[in-house]
Amino acid sequence: LSPLTFLERTKDIYPNYEAVVYESRSYTWNEVYKRCVKFASALDKLGVKIGDTVSVMAFNTPEIFEAHYSIPMVGAVINAINTRLDPKTVSYILEHSDAKVLIVDRQFHEVITKALKNVKNKIIIIDIDDRDIDTSTFKKIGELEYESFLSSGDENYEWKKPKDEWQAISL
């Protein structure tokens, strides 16, 4: 058993039950599952492999909820970064975890921009553009945007279950 199989089972048993409610958005378990599979597929197409670290810095939005499933679905390890940390600490975490991808809410553009100046490795940035708030004052951080990136995935992607209980899915 893993959180991934719990999601799969919940989707099968309660497909039309509400799973996530956030501001003007809500998703059923079936929709959450499909979004997670598509995002995992998009990460796979990006080159994320088993054991790679994908960091996330976001508020409690549907995107971070989905990340907790979609990142392990591709065999990668999720590294959720505390939203209250300063740029120096975020930089250390990104460097030390050897993050390949960073999914980040644009509201953290100041912290992340400063943090990335001290990170030696190249990190692919995926911006979360929260459509339920005014983001006009938040600068774009990366080249990719979460919803567009998600839409590039395949909802029929054959995601990877952990090989055993020792395979890491989170830091």
Task: For each feature predicted by the language model, list its residue ranges.
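Conserved pre-ATP/AMP-binding loop-to-beta segment of ANL
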Residues: P15, D127, E143-L144, L150-L171
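Conserved AMP-binding/adenylate-forming core of the ANL superfamily
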Residues: N16-T61, F65-Y69, D86-S91, G142-S148
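Domain-wide signal for the mature, well-folded portions of proteins, strongly enriched
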Residues: D12, S26-N30, L94, A115-L116, ...
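Hydrophobic/aromatic residues within well-ordered alpha-helical segments
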Residues: T10, R35-C36, V119, W166
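A short N-terminal helical cap/helix-turn-helix that marks the beginning
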Residues: L1-A19
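Structural core segment of the AMP-binding/adenylate-forming
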Residues: K45-L46, M73-S148
